């Protein structure tokens, strides 16, 4: 007999899943029955929040959904922060949990791990939450999840299986293929957008995370129109060192001026989030008069109306738009405008920010093609303002949007397992590192060769600065850090401490040469 738990593993394999992150418990043992016989790799984090963040990092690095297995109740609630981050950043994540036996649900009988309404709670953060009530539901629920991931704006999905359903017979249930894809670009909208492009003299492209797989057509469109390309945080790595690239945040006044002076703005895969566009100051982000929006999500297009809205995958829409553009390529001043904006944007930054950006550039240059996974720490904040990365999708962090501390270490582990050929660096602070520091053990178990770079400024210095800026005496911002090198060594992981950031490049190369997890602590005044 094949149980529902065993069938789940078979169906996940059929959907292309090769890795799951999870901590087994008494309510999910049946989910593990089929794992030993499958090709799916199981990675055991030290906390379920780590499972969620690992699934997130895996998804961002690979482009495939990250999957987490967690127990009923506390195991699931521990993943909510990670699911919130995935929801904010449109990351495909499938969280599969147990739930108490069907006859007991909602009765408050005091069973182990019981919640009053687990699925109702998850519906508030997941794109959808589905309870399996019988074996025959399982293929359809999974097909719905994977169809959503490929056809619209992705995010976290939750499927729960009651303990009594997990052990039910599931012989004869079969895989349901998912043929769903994003909608085709509307021909009339493409034609209207092409007309706007043809008449534009000062166009600008805004690229968001939804455009990170569209580098080739995006580059051709930028060159065709002579349009500077502004990259939000999740789009960094596009058009690396290209003369039309502007790897700077629209929060900077120079970038906002570039956008304000444009006679056409093409926004590709960006939600216009306040943390990317400084919606909190300077009067908020002023939408341009002529705006073309390309987004896979209809809800996103509805939130900020445009002159022309195109619901489609960014790469497909841009290819369609290029096919409608006639005449010679632009010979305008796009490269001049881009260069002037880059120069002015850098001039806005303080010497401290500039030094922190140089530290990130040191990582990039020492390890070409690296994936740098950031936590909320000073050099990450600085680089989110201005930083040019050399790999599309290779710079991501949780310092914008939902802004969860502790994201970096487990997300970097997920990324390293997804793309084992790439160097992976976790850039974290001493405060944020302590949120998920035990995942060093998971990195060692999984042989994930993450280089953990710890920016140790002995506290929450960014929060301290914010307090001082508004006249609040700093309180609670100086938690004493441990000796990170000794902690790493306790896990069996090599570590070194740097007092001079000038030695960082050599340390990174030493770390990479080991092929193992490694900790580099940088002490900062």
Placement of each model-derived feature along the sequence:
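Conserved structured core elements
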Residues: 25, 215, 256, 312-315, ...
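N-terminal alpha/beta PP-like core and its mobile active-site loop of ThDP/TPP-dependent enzymes
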Residues: 1-325, 362-365, 449-452, 488, ...
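Active-site flanking residues adjacent to catalytic metal/cofactor-binding acidic residues
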Residues: 268, 294, 374, 429-430, ...
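Phosphate/pyrophosphate-binding active-site segments
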Residues: 136, 287-376, 499-525
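A general structural motif
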Residues: 47, 107-112, 180-192, 211, ...
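Active-site diphosphate/adenylate-binding microenvironment
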Residues: 5-8, 23-36, 337-421
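Thiamine diphosphate
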Residues: 104, 108-113, 259, 301-302, ...
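Active-site-proximal loop/turn and secondary-structure-junction residues that shape catalytic pockets
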Residues: 163-165, 378, 524
């Amino acid at each position: 007999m094949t149980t529902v738990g065993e069938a789940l593993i078979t169906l996940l394999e059929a959907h292309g899943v090769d890795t799951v992150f999870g901590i087994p418990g008494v309510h999910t043992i049946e989910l593990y029955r089929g794992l030993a016989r499958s090709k799916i790799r199981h990675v055991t984090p030290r906390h379920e929040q780590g499972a969620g963040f690992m699934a997130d990092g895996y998804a961002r690095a690979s482009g495939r959904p990250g999957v987490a297995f967690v127990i009923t109740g506390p195991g699931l609630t521990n993943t909510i922060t990670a699911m919130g981050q995935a929801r904010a950043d449109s990351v495909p994540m499938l969280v599969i949990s147990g739930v108490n036996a069907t006859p007991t649900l909602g009765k408050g009988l005091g069973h182990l791990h019981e919640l009053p309404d687990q699925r109702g709670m998850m519906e508030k953060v997941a794109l959808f939450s589905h309870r399996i009530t019988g074996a025959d539901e399982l293929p359809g629920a999974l097909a719905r999840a994977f169809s959503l991931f490929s056809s619209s704006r992705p995010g976290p999905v939750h499927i729960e299986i009651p303990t009594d359903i997990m052990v039910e017979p599931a012989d004869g249930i079969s895989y349901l293929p998912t043929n769903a894809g994003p909608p085709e670009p509307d021909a009339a909208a493409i034609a209207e957008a092409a007309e706007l492009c043809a008449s534009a003299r000062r166009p600008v492209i805004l690229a968001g995370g939804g455009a990170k797989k569209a580098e080739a057509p995006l580059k051709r469109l930028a060159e065709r129109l002579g349009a500077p390309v502004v990259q939000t945080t999740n789009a960094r790595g596009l058009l690396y060192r290209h003369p039309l690239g502007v790897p700077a945040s629209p929060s900077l006044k120079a970038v906002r001026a570039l956008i304000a002076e444009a006679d056409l703005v093409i926004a590709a895969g960006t939600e216009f989030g306040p943390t990317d566009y400084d919606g909190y100051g300077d009067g908020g982000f002023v939408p341009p008069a002529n705006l073309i929006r390309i987004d896979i999500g209809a809800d996103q297009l509805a939130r900020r109306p445009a002159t022309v809205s195109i619901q489609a995958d960014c790469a497909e829409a841009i290819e369609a738009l290029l096919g409608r553009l006639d005449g010679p390529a632009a010979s305008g001043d796009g490269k001049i405008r881009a260069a002037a904006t880059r120069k002015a944007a850098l001039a806005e930054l303080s010497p401290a920010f500039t030094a922190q950006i140089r530290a990130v550039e040191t990582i990039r240059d020492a390890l070409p093609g690296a994936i740098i996974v950031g936590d909320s720490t000073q050099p990450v904040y600085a680089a989110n303002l201005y930083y040019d990365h050399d790999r599309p999708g290779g710079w991501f962090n949780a310092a914008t949007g939902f802004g969860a501390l502790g994201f970096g270490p487990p997300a970097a582990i997920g990324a390293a397992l997804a793309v084992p050929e790439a160097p992976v660096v976790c850039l974290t602070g001493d405060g944020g590192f302590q949120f998920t520091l035990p995942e060093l053990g998971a990195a060692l178990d999984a042989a994930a060769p993450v280089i953990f770079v710890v920016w140790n400024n002995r506290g929450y210095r960014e929060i301290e600065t914010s307090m001082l800026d508004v006249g609040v005496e700093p309180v609670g911002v100086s938690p004493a850090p441990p000796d990170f090198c000794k902690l790493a060594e306790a896990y069996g992981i090599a570590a070194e401490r740097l007092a001079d950031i000038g030695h960082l490049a050599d340390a990174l190369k030493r770390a990479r040469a080991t092929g193992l997890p490694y900790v580099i602590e940088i002490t900062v005044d």
